């Protein structure tokens, strides 16, 4: 028995590689043959290593035995005439975004962007997504703040789409992409209202006596109202203003002359343009009637009566009366004079000493 039996532990690994190949369609395959093929290529390497660390195991007494199996699978499929179906999801999104940018904003605004799924039952709206519990949430991205704005949760997808459309128009203007087109009622409301024609008020005029035609025309121009005023009380005020004015004449008993004319000269007219010195205001002063006889017009003999002692009757000094003739000869007056002379001498002496 010369056979060698290897009792080393065995480690088996398998490496699989898959790829897809596309071929042109043939008449046989179109008639009813299978169009899908799968080719597998297998190879086993008994002395293969998994990593560089396997060489270090040779130093051990019983190193492990490595067996590696390689499997290559090739799937052959017929090619498709429609190129879009063979494009990956990333390329498909890229193509859809580029097509949206090429469209004009006006056409995209009128066309509702409703997306129908493969099943054809659920509609997808822009900015609307469904929650796991069944409600619909709406959100929009603010281009200025560069963040998403939460719009709320709604029962139906249409309600959420309408809220998104309003927010998009508010943030991006009337040319923003919306889910629904603007109804014609709102467009009619946006039209300018018709201008209101204002009626001109009828002015009632009454004939007034005037001295000349030019004065009457000037008064009419002053009291005309503006064409835009339509108030009734304005016309009443105009009628009151246009009534004839009574000329204000001064009463006969009241004079409008200045204060220096009053009582002196009334024949110069009613104007106040004169100066005080223009009128002879001293005429009436000298033409007045002579006054009554005064004391100064009497002769001196009549003024002084027979009693010459009129000033010598009483002299009030300290509450006592005295006779002037007696007092002049009395010694008290002499004593008073001596006291004044002594006072003068003492005052002069004090001034000299100082």
Curated annotation (Swiss-Prot):
PROSITE patterns membership: AP2_ERF
DNA-binding region, residue intervals: 124-181
Biased composition (Acidic residues): 185-196
Entry-linked Gene3D superfamilies: AP2/ERF domain (3.30.730.10)
Compositional bias ranges of the Low complexity kind: 205-215
Subcellular location: Cytoplasm; Nucleus
Keywords: Activator, Cytokinin signaling pathway, Cytoplasm, DNA-binding, Ethylene signaling pathway, Nucleus, Transcription, Transcription regulation
Extent of Polar residues compositional bias: 96-120
Protein family per UniProt: Belongs to the AP2/ERF transcription factor family. ERF subfamily.
Protein's job: Component of the cytokinin signaling pathway involved in cotyledons, leaves, and embryos development. Probably acts as a transcriptional activator. Binds to the GCC-box pathogenesis-related promoter element. May be involved in the regulation of gene expression by stress factors and by components of stress signal transduction pathways.
Protein name: Ethylene-responsive transcription factor CRF3
Protein source organism: Arabidopsis thaliana (Mouse-ear cress)
Lineage of origin: Eukaryota, Viridiplantae, Streptophyta, Embryophyta, Tracheophyta
UniProt gene name: CRF3
